[in-house]
Amino acid sequence: MEVGGRKRGKPDGANGAGGKRARESESFQTGVGSKSKPCTKFFSTSGCPFGEGCHFLHHFPGGYQAVAKMTNLGGPAIAPPPGRMPMGNAVPDGPPTPTVKTRLCNKYNTAEGCKWGDKCHFAHGERELGKPMLMDSSMPPPMGPRPTGHFAPPPMPSPAMSTPASFGASATAKISVDASLAGGIIGRGGVNTKQISRVTGAKLAIRDHESDTNLKNIELEGTFDQIKNASAMVRELIVSIGGGAPPQGKKPVGGSHRGGGPGSNFKTKLCENFTKGSCTFGDRCHFAHGENELRKSAAA
């Protein structure tokens, strides 16, 4: 009987059929609990080679559309059948397996630079090779690897990566001065306004007054500190060019701050700019516009 049993077993084992049946039986018994997930092969163009013996569902609620949504639009990855390679279209349900930086970032040392900063999954220099990746809890799950293996960071930067332009509150200020002082405040070729902007960082512009044609508006834009410093420089400039009197007064005050001299120096010298035709102060000028305006010095 034993010999006969061996003879009956030979034909099945000669071509490996006996081993195949044993493996299929074992695999089927261990995979019975997997009948809760759809078979990706069945719902693909290639079809499922296992037929009724497949360990995954061939009848899934929602059909192809539901399975396609799960596999292509970020749903949970479907486990492959035991002993087979995982499907290529399975989407990772979290960060990539590598948690350290193993490659150099090819954007770091370029002119445009790397826009991901500390959140980049590549090393910014050899010193970062092997450094753990910075995983932001607010970062959404990546939508699949790029051809280079670089998983996409979140599309929007975090508040900590906001642009420097948003730092510091922006404000505006307006100073009204006599229109005759505008030229002196601007300076030849805009030298004065450029200097104020360069030193304080505030933007400065001189525009017409809304209602009074005898006045000009000096408009300042920047942070509160920038406007404060620029306003102080503008007022010092107005005093230095002899515009210390308020805009309402049409006659200049006797006291002149030019050169720190006493008020008796008013109109005691000829205006050099007037002879060149470039005086911008007009009647407000503290120097004489011609011999007929010359006054004798009080010291004399």
Swiss-Prot record:
Coiled-coil segments: none
Chain intervals annotated as zinc finger (C3H1-type): 33-61, 99-127, 265-292
Every KH domain range: 170-234
GO biological process: regulation of gene expression
Keyword Cell cycle: no
SUPFAM superfamilies cross-referenced by the UniProt entry: CCCH zinc finger, Eukaryotic type KH-domain (KH-domain type I)
GO MF terms held by the record: DNA binding; mRNA binding; zinc ion binding
Intrachain S-S bonds: none
Keywords, ordered alphabetically: DNA-binding, Metal-binding, Repeat, RNA-binding, Zinc, Zinc-finger
Pfam family, one: KH_1
Lineage top rank: taxon: Eukaryota
GO cellular component terms, A-Z: cytoplasm
Region (Disordered): 1-38, 243-262
PANTHER family attached to this UniProt entry: CCCH ZINC FINGER/TIS11-RELATED, ZINC FINGER CCCH DOMAIN-CONTAINING PROTEIN 52
Name of the molecule in the record: Zinc finger CCCH domain-containing protein 14
Lineage of the organism: Eukaryota, Viridiplantae, Streptophyta, Embryophyta, Tracheophyta
